[in-house]
Amino acid sequence: MSEMLLFEALREGLQEEMDRDPKVLVMGEDVGHYGGSYKVTKGFAEKYGDLRLLDTPIAENSFTGMAIGAAMTGLRPVVEGMNMGFLLLAFNQIANNAGMLHYTSGANFTIPIVIRGPGGVGRQLGAEHSQRLESYFQSVPGLQLVACSTPINAKGLIKSSIRSENPVILFEHVLLYNLKETIPDNEYLVCLEKAEIVRPGTDITILTYSRMRHHVLQATKSLVYKGYDPEIIDIVSLKPVDLGTISTSIKKTHKVLIVEECMRTGGIGASLRATIMEHLFDFLDAPIMCLSSQDVPTPYSGPLEELTVIQPAQIVQAVEQLCNNGNN
């Protein structure tokens, strides 16, 4: 067992897969000799060489397309976006090629590509560097979306993503890279389709992912002190969602709170709420509540930025409201 920061866990997982499979390669801006914008690939260029660590121009559409072509030939490329917001420039390649080529080629091609990088609301990074792209990509057929939230699941998810035959987008939150946790020494994988029960409980099901997992855990300290017993589930797989784990929890608690950093309109929470209403309506004792970021560009101002994102106090208030209303 050894303590690692989240970015170090990603590095170790990626390195293990590159050692295991010579078909795995990495491409992106500054991933080579600079070691990546957050040092996930530090030291890789010296170990694996320039053919497996490809420094690219600032041309996201081009190098993402190049990676998709490499995947079609049997390689397993890992594309790092210096910031996830810049992957909007590669949306055509990701949507029309990565997501759909397996189908449109009559299953003649598989696209085992991983697209990963930092995103989410940081600390005064401005609107363009504070994007949450999960809502953009969730409607693209053929893509699998996962979000890491701890060093342990970050390492396991990147390994499983690389081994998948499907195109996977791995969302990493910029404020979680320095999160520290003890990592098992033995090799392990994290299932791409399985949610994690972070805390069992009986009063309410709280569904969350990425950075908001930690906001929920912070709020839970106050909730437990006040006598509430929330069940916390990190959904991990944003698409497809693990409806089995979610169903079991809701049939026990009968109340649901969704907490996300994604935008309210068209976000992961909106899709999740629709799925729950379709499949589990009869088990609900109260309306589903969804706490999401405001539908505004993220301000540069620190105090204004904080107001756009859900805070622990709002989670406490929402749980109190749902539990009290549901018990009336």
From Swiss-Prot:
EC number(s) on file: 1.2.4.1
Cofactor: thiamine diphosphate
CDD domains: TPP_PYR_E1-PDHc-beta_like
GO CC terms: chloroplast
Predominant cellular place of this UniProt entry's protein: plastid
Keywords associated with the record: Chloroplast, Metal-binding, Oxidoreductase, Plastid, Potassium, Pyruvate, Thiamine pyrophosphate
Compartment list: Plastid, Chloroplast
Cross-referenced Pfam families: Transket_pyr (PF02779), Transketolase_C (PF02780)
GO MF term list: metal ion binding; pyruvate dehydrogenase (acetyl-transferring) activity
Lineage: superkingdom: Eukaryota
Chain positions recorded as K(+) binding sites: I113, I162, N166
Subunit structure: Heterodimer of an alpha and a beta chain.
Function in brief: The pyruvate dehydrogenase complex catalyzes the overall conversion of pyruvate to acetyl-CoA and CO(2). It contains multiple copies of three enzymatic components: pyruvate dehydrogenase (E1), dihydrolipoamide acetyltransferase (E2) and lipoamide dehydrogenase (E3).
Protein name (record): Pyruvate dehydrogenase E1 component subunit beta
